Amino acid sequence: MNRQLSGENATFMDRLKAAVNSFGLPRLIIAGFLLLLFIAAPFVGADFATQITNTLNRFSWNAILVLAMVPMIHSGCGLNFGLPLGIISGLLGATLSIEFGFTGAMSFVMAIVIATPFALILGAGYGWLLNKIKGGEMMIATYVGFSSVSFMCMMWLLLPYKKPEMVWGFSGSGLRTTISLEGFYDRVLADILSIDLNRFGINLVIPTGSLIFFAILAFLMWAFLHTKTGTAMTAVGSNPSFAKAAGVSIDKMRLISVVLSTWLGAVGILVYEQGFGFIQIYTAPLKMAFPAVAAILIGGASVNKASIANVIIGTFLYQGLVTMTPTVINSLIHLDISEIIRIIVSNGMIVYALTRKMGGKK
């Protein structure tokens, strides 16, 4: 009897150990800490429902930007530190949509339509460059992202925008640093089928439309990765020699992945803006790749393997911690240092994520 019990205990422990290894001990610790913050929130005076709302909002804003990492990881191009190229495409689509006089939901649709050719052109050039420097993609991508943002800092002042809602009032030219989306596509997705419990005295609002939009894109990405092209792309990333021997064009697959990633970055920033309520330009896109990279790595991805589950888990853990940690600690010590704590936590998680080499077992 004792031998049978010890055997069952050993089996249970083996299963538990396998589950921990599969999920990843670091992610388990991060998830446990996030759960602890949610539990502690009501005891330090932070409204629990409000914190859930904030976390879901930040998840819906950032999830597509994290999803943009998946194609390039699958093709072996590594982490997309050149995400600002896609973001710039989205910003061009957003500002031109407003400049052309579109309002409401149509301004969001037209922003995507206008951003698409920019994303395709910039993505193709970016992909061509990465094909020339195989092995150093992530370093070059970082410089591409930084230099493109710096170049656009000049162009935002020089491009002939005339819409009064966007240009500087004293000169009538040059775009403002921050542009309000009120009257345009502010919360155009978030308010679709949104669940608002404020009428019942609960400060919980679920941005259903934004979550559904992300779910659709995530499903399309999953479906694409299971097509012939998607399978060839994954083969290029996992074993280039085998893919080449099978007749797959490595450069073509890598180019497709970069273009797709750039387009997702453009759509992702538009979704971010509609939830946030503002367009921010000039240096705003400079470091937006780093939280997205950190999120997908924390979710369990590696530099050559990623899944939709990694995107969802990583985005929720990263944005949950960035949202909850400052709120709980602020309420606990009664000092307004939320921004300092947010910077420490977000950059600390980025450093941790970038030091990881493998997926779940690390």
Segments the model singles out, each with a brief description of its role:
Residues 86-90, 141-147, 308-321:
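Central hydrophobic cores of alpha-helical transmembrane segments
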Residues 259-343:
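Transmembrane alpha-helical segments in multi-pass inner-membrane proteins
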Residues 29-41, 69, 146-153, 210-222, ...:
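Hydrophobic core segments of alpha-helical transmembrane domains in multi-pass membrane transport
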